[in-house]
Amino acid sequence: NKLDAVGDDAATAFGHIRSALEKFAKEAGIEVTAIVPISALKGHNVVEAAERGWCGYSGASLLDILEALPVTPADTALPFAFPVQWVEKFSSSADTSQGRRIFWGRVANGVATVGQQVKVLPSGQTATVAQVLGTTRKPGTVQAGHSAGVVLDREVDVSRGDWLLALVPPAQAAITSDDDFSDTPTATSLPPSRELSATVAWMDDEPLVAGRVYWALHGHRWVKARVKRVVHRLAINTLAEEAADSLSANSIGHIELLLQEPIAAMPFEASRVLGSLVLVDTATHRTAGAVLVRANH
């Protein structure tokens, strides 16, 4: 923006900026769709393309490029995962003629469908989806990214913060080494984990150090999380990984977390909802860090 203020050297300035951005994006692993010189003051390349050749650029306007970008598909191809946000207890609504509870939330992964077998985390109880409610009341299916109400075929212990996870058919289920979740016929397609490798953007004035304990919010569930190790700090200007034993405010780094209870986490690249957490200071209740899961163990 503001390249009109450069005057006759706008093309040269834009060339330098474009080269620097392309280099940075390559090092950071960011795919660049377009780099557009604009002038908000004069409207160049914002809604309509500027005069051909302005700043040495002859491509489309910013608005045209944004409108042509593909919409990021919802995570419908992933196994069903549903964080429970609210429990409507023993509804007398006509939508649930048997008076069962409705579990409301937004589908994180997959598709909510009638007949889907699920396992409740953390209780481990299993059930089958009997009804799916949505904005059209009884749509039958609700895809990831949309809000839904789920009614199960039997009464199980489900509260706000719990997760409903798709079950793997017995023939596909693999026996895990985790005693708490090794029941093959009811194994979930997303094995819960207590240990996470993650990238954190640290926002608290109190530095992040190994051994500190925080509240971690995953979906709508709160669990205690201990910082097992600070692996490295990311140098913002060079993207180099620097050795570090702590992270100060506004730092980004790689850490390892040990959770008090298992959660259904997966890498952020695969699922935005299941791959993100928020760390909160247990004493001050300040939001301390934003976490992107890289791997679970």
Predicted regions located by residue number:
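C-terminal effector/interaction modules appended to NTPase cores
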Residues: 91-297
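Residues that form ligand- and interface-recognition hot spots within folded domains
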Residues: 88
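Short, solvent-exposed loop/turn segments at secondary-structure junctions
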Residues: 3-7, 234-236
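Active-site glycine-centered loops adjacent to acidic/histidine catalytic or metal-binding residues
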Residues: 1, 39, 115
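Canonical P-loop GTPase G-domain recognition
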Residues: 6-79
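Polyanion-binding loop/helix "lid" in catalytic or ligand-binding cores
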Residues: 84
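A generic structural signal for short coil/turn motifs at secondary-structure boundaries
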Residues: 5-10, 45-47, 93, 138, ...
